[in-house]
Each structure stands twice: as C-alpha cells, then as structure tokens.
Amino acid sequence: MNGTEGPFFYIPMVNTTGIVRSPYEYPQYYLVNPAAYAALGAYMFFLILTGFPINFLTLYVTLEHKKLRTALNLILLNLAVADLFMVFGGFTTTMYTSMHGYFVLGRLGCNVEGFFATLGGEIALWSLVVLAVERWVVVCKPISNFRFTENHAIMGVAFSWIMAATCAVPPLVGWSRYIPEGMQCSCGVDYYTRAEGFNNESFVIYMFIVHFLAPLIVIFFCYGRLLCAVKEAAAAQQESETTQRAEREVTRMVIIMVIGFLTSWLPYASVAWYIFTHQGTEFGPLFMTIPAFFAKSSALYNPMIYICMNKQFRHCMITTLCCGKNPFEEEEGASTTKTEASSVSSSSVSPA
C-alpha cells in the first residue's frame, strides 16, 4: 500500500521515514508546502464571501416578492438552503482547519463536517434532478393536463432531502465512514481503504450508481427531451423571431446546466472511483483535494446558473438591491414581453 492507514484516517504517503502523523493531532505540512494550506484557506474564504451573500439574497428576495413565491421556486429555495448548508457546514470548517494545517476539530468534527458537506451537496444535486423532471413534464407534456402545484414542489423538496439523507447518514452509523481526505483539512467518504467492519466497497458502489450515475442519466434525458421539444416548436413556426430566440435561450441554458453539473461532480466522482478501484496506487494529496473543491464550489455557481439567469428573479433582485427601483426596468420589460409572445416562451423552458 502506497499510503499509511491509521484509526479513522488514511495518509497518501508511506511512513518509511516515520514522519507521518495523525491528521487529528499534528500539522500535515510534510504532505505539501504550508503555502498550499494558506491558499486553500483563502479559497474557502472566497467561497464563503461570495456563496453566502448570493444564496442568502436568493432566500431574501424570494420571501420579499410575492410573485416569486411559486411552486417551482420552492425547489430553487431548497437549492439555496442546500448551498448554505455547504457554506456553513463545510467551507467554514475547512477554512479553520486549513489555517492549522490539519483537522484540528478531531473525529467528531470530521463526522459533522463530512455529514453537512455531503448532505448539502446531495440536496443540491437532487434538487437539480427535480428541476429537470419538472421542466420535462411541463414543457414536453408526457402527462396531459399536468400542472406543477405547491404539493408537487413540497414532494420534490422532501424527495431531495430523503435521497440526500440516504447518502450522508450511512457513514455515521457504520456503513462506510468519514475520514480526512486530500490535504487532511476536510472530510469525505472513505474511498481509500477496505477497513474491516465498515463495508466501504458496497457503499461506494451504491453511492456511485444511485447518487451519481442515476442523477446524470435523468438530467441528460430530461433536458435532451426539452431541447427536442423546443426545436420541434421552432420548426413549426420557422418565421417566428420570438420562437427562434426562445430556442437559442433554451439551448444556451441547457448547455450551461449540463456543463455546470459535469464541472461540479464528474471530476470528483471520477477521481473517487479511480482511487476506490486502484487502492494501493500511489497518488498525492492534491489528487483528491482539487476535484473535491470543484464539487464544493457548486454552492457559488449553482444560484448563478439556475436563479440569476431567470429574468423575473433578476428583476426582483435588482429592485431589492436598488431600494425598490429597477434602473433597467424598461429594458427588462421589453425583453420579457418579446419572450412571452412566443408559443415556447422562456418562462416555459427556463429553470423557473
């Protein structure tokens, strides 16, 4: 094994020189330059500084403006809550531990940080799945006369929490475990060892299939069908400028959504699966650290993609920030009027 395994930790370095120490008790500066820990702390501070305001603003603006309190926006609010879970449960902890160079909060802190980071990420992921299914059902109409109501939204929120819990809770009760990973300043599921009594192998396979491949397939299917529906509508009205504009908007939105999903989760899932299937292979601490924080940074660009690109929300947000006035109101109104004139309007094919 090209690493050192101890009680509830795995260090990606062979302890031939005797310098490897527990990441709960000693600084891990022998793994990487101390400057890397400072950079990690700075990056976490940046995510807190940007992720908290934009997600809090999402909650505040939605609660302030009655016209935003729609059934679908409950899912978007759930997404913002999930991102705030990651900010407070994961980013603040990682920033604090990186300042010390090791997981100074101990085993209990590792469980708490790993749980909240996993829970927040999974709630966000399954919220995106619910959004994709909702857009597919509403726009493509596989179920005739279907109307997305508040009850459907509540069920979608409950579904996202249940699915997130089925991923975040098991490591707390003995099916796998949370251990420090990468530079040993944040905690995640144990992909690294086959520790006796934890059944890591079965949990990782379960998590990869149910909590990565399944959401990926659903999102691709739903937005693929959505794009086809918009193209068919545009073909039926080839001379309609507003329809063609709606198609371009949806195409751009779908591309951004897919890229956002893949950028967040594909690197992390791929590296985790590689480590799991190649246990004993030599790799450095940055090998897992970098993709892990690609996934965590989704707390910043999730609301930018799924909420700030919504015209109605953007209008309300500007109104709130400008003390009740929108200096761009005439331009926003004209754009909205043009889009609503289309039989395939942006309100039907955008995330909200």
Swiss-Prot record:
Disulfide bonds join 110-187. It comes from the Eukaryota. Residues 1-36, 97-110, 174-202, 275-286 are extracellular. It is a multi-pass membrane protein. The record marks 113 as: Plays an important role in the conformation switch to the active conformation. A motif ('Ionic lock' involved in activated form stabilization) lies at residues 134-136. It is found in: Membrane; Cell projection, Cilium, Photoreceptor outer segment. InterPro entries: GPCR_opsins, GPCR_Rhodpsn, GPCR_Rhodpsn_7TM, Opsin, Retinal_BS, Rhodopsin, Rhodopsin_N. Residues 62-73, 134-152, 225-252, 309-352 are cytoplasmic. Keywords: Cell projection, Chromophore, Disulfide bond, G-protein coupled receptor, Glycoprotein, Lipoprotein, Membrane, Palmitate, Phosphoprotein, Photoreceptor protein, Receptor, Retinal protein, Sensory transduction, Transducer, Transmembrane, Transmembrane helix, Vision. Photoreceptor required for image-forming vision at low light intensity. While most salt water fish species use retinal as chromophore, most freshwater fish use 3-dehydroretinal, or a mixture of retinal and 3-dehydroretinal. Light-induced isomerization of 11-cis to all-trans retinal triggers a conformational change that activates signaling via G-proteins. Subsequent receptor phosphorylation mediates displacement of the bound G-protein alpha subunit by arrestin and terminates signaling. Belongs to the G-protein coupled receptor 1 family. Opsin subfamily. This is Rhodopsin. It comes from Pomatoschistus minutus (Sand goby). The lineage of its organism: Eukaryota, Metazoa, Chordata, Craniata, Vertebrata.
